A protein has these predicted regions:
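Sec-dependent N-terminal signal peptides of Gram-positive bacterial secreted proteins and lipoproteins
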Residues: 2-24
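Bacterial lipoprotein signal-peptidase II cleavage site
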Residues: 20-38
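N-terminal low-complexity, Pro/Thr/Ser-rich intrinsically disordered segments
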Residues: 36-70, 74-75
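Extracytoplasmic substrate-binding proteins
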Residues: 56, 61-64, 71-73, 155-230, ...
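Structural recognition of the beta-strand scaffold that forms the well-ordered cores
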Residues: 82-84, 100-105, 145-149, 166-170, ...
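A short, structured surface patch at a secondary-structure boundary
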Residues: 83-141, 145-147, 151, 250
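Proline-aspartate-enriched helix->loop->beta-strand connector
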Residues: 127-130, 135-148, 164, 263-280
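Alpha-helical, coiled-coil/dimerization segments enriched in small aliphatic residues
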Residues: 231-259, 263
């Protein structure tokens, strides 16, 4: 059988991801003597998958259940999409259907991952935010399918009255992220691509878990976007990242479902081994290290304060690439088991395969 250029590209990229997912994440010294993941470079257009040629066909009309439990019937294969949520927009890029987007969430022009993978999205009409969704603006674009965050559940009936077919997503943990991938892959007739995406994530997390093994789990305090006195409890996605990286959440007793406000006294009482700043924190590592109120905290005293990667996207949000946050965190918490190079290789392979670019920065 003759191999097309697209088939050859996808095969090479899959090999790169397999190399990352299957490589033991050993220390940097050992990693330097082993082969790095194969380098694959591709433009966003080449990396995109053409559903009709490469995917398992979906039959329409199609009835799916979205992440609010709503049964939604999609009458015909959607050719135009609108996404009111950066997480679903990123997921649609990973599924290779970015060219079908006609409207995206507000501030798309500020998202680095869009400029690297699908710059045309940054000039598309905005359909607002979860707080201020532009119903009429979205309807004017006449999209075949609209994807919104579950926070907009009260607005969905109005969207439907305007003739829009709407799916809500709520990828608040690892399983629900996989559920969002399944939902959108099925809706957009990209099922095979969705399965590949999930397998890539699962394989890399499995490699991470195997590398960490039974290493002792340090306690981790995950600090929020606005203040070091915000933290993520077990109900938040960040908790799964800590667990995936072989750590224990210092705020495991917190019951809030969003960033919890805590006191300096509480942080000192928990006395975490590490303090990790959110990707989008509007303060920096030095400000925490120099905070006199935290001087007696083990993490500060030992200099174990880090910020999650943010150069490409916020990896502590439930986007497809969020597993890289766990890999990075694993390299911080368990440097003898998980090398920094392993994190770089995983990032290279993932973004090349699913977003069409090779990272210039891993921070």
């Amino acid at each position: 059988m003759k191999m097309t250029k697209m088939t050859a590209l996808l095969l090479a990229a899959a090999m790169a991801l397999t190399a990352c997912g299957g490589t033991t994440a050993v220390s940097s010294e050992a990693a330097s003597s082993s082969a790095a993941a194969p380098e694959v470079t591709a433009s966003p257009e080449e990396a995109a998958v053409e559903p009709a040629a490469a995917e398992t066909a979906v039959t329409y009309p199609l009835t799916v259940t979205d992440q609010l439990g709503r049964e939604v019937t999609i009458e015909t294969e959607p050719k135009t999409l609108a996404s009111g949520y950066y997480i679903s927009t990123s997921l649609l890029i990973a599924l290779g259907v970015q060219d079908e987007l006609v409207g995206v969430e507000a501030k798309a022009d500020k998202r680095t991952i869009y400029s690297l993978s699908a710059p045309e999205l940054q000039s598309l009409p905005s359909i607002g935010t979860a707080k201020e969704f532009d119903l009429e603006g979205c309807a004017a674009l006449t999209p075949d399918l609209v994807i919104v965050p579950a926070k907009l559940k009260d607005s969905i009936p109005q969207m439907e009255e305007l003739g829009l077919t709407v799916l809500a997503v709520k990828p608040e943990d690892q399983d629900k992220l996989y559920g969002a991938i399944d939902l959108l892959a099925q809706a957009t007739n990209t099922v095979a691509r969705g399965e590949e995406l999930k397998s890539a994530i699962e394989d890399n997390l499995l490699s991470l878990h195997e590398a960490i093994g039974d290493a002792e789990a340090p306690t981790v305090y995950m600090a929020g976007n606005s203040s070091v006195l915000q933290t993520a409890g077990p109900a938040m996605y960040q908790n799964y990242m800590i667990e995936n990286a072989g750590g224990l959440n210092a705020a495991a007793s917190v019951e809030d479902t969003y960033w919890a406000e805590v006191s300096y006294e509480q942080v000192l009482d928990w006395d975490p081994d590490y303090i990790i700043l959110a990707s989008d924190a509007d303060y920096d590592v030095d400000s925490v290290l120099n905070d006199a109120a935290l001087a007696d905290c083990t993490a500060v005293r030992e200099g174990y304060v880090y910020q999650l990667p943010h150069a490409i996207e916020a990896v502590d949000s439930p986007v497809p690439g969020s597993f890289l946050g766990s890999v990075y965190l694993g390299s911080v918490l368990h440097p003898e088991q998980v090398s920094e190079q392993f994190y770089h290789d995983c990032a290279d392979a993932f973004y090349t395969t699913y977003y069409g670019f090779t990272p210039a920065s891993y921070e």
